[in-house]
């Protein structure tokens, strides 16, 4: 059962969630390197995509709600940076669950397979060599 942010019922198989929506994938990628609050997720997505993807609050928080309900992300009970400015106490921080990390890895593997198939068919260019000759 894929095609949404999370499955309709609880599942321990990350594959059951695939394919993720672009919004869900962007949220999970934003959380892959640590906890973030909602606005931080929006900023990370905008920066990572060069401004091509901008998540509005309604879209973002709808996805967060569904991802939480599916056990993919969770709300953190503590602030990751106790030195943050006053007023940040109200911010809710989110993080990937262990299951959510598996979902993200499964989706990246699925997308990688699609890209490899497209390259075999000549539908997209081969990757550019990385600097340094690797």
Question: What do these predicted regions represent?
Answer:
Residues 1-16, 81:
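N-terminal intrinsically disordered/low-complexity leader segments
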Residues 60-70:
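Basic amphipathic alpha-helical segments that dock to polyanions
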């Amino acid at each position: 059962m894929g095609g949404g942010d999370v499955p309709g019922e609880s599942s321990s198989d990350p594959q059951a969630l695939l394919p993720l929506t672009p919004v869900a994938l962007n949220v999970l990628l934003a959380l892959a390197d640590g906890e973030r609050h909602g606005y931080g997720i929006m900023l990370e997505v905008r920066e990572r995509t060069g401004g091509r993807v901008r998540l509005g609050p309604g879209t973002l928080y709808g996805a967060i709600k569904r991802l939480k309900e599916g056990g993919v992300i969770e709300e953190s009970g503590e602030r990751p940076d106790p030195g943050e400015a006053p007023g940040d106490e109200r911010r809710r921080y989110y993080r990937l669950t262990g299951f959510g990390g598996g979902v993200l890895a499964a989706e990246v593997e699925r997308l990688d397979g699609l890209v490899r198939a497209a390259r075999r068919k000549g539908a997209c260019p081969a990757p550019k060599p990385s600097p340094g000759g690797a």
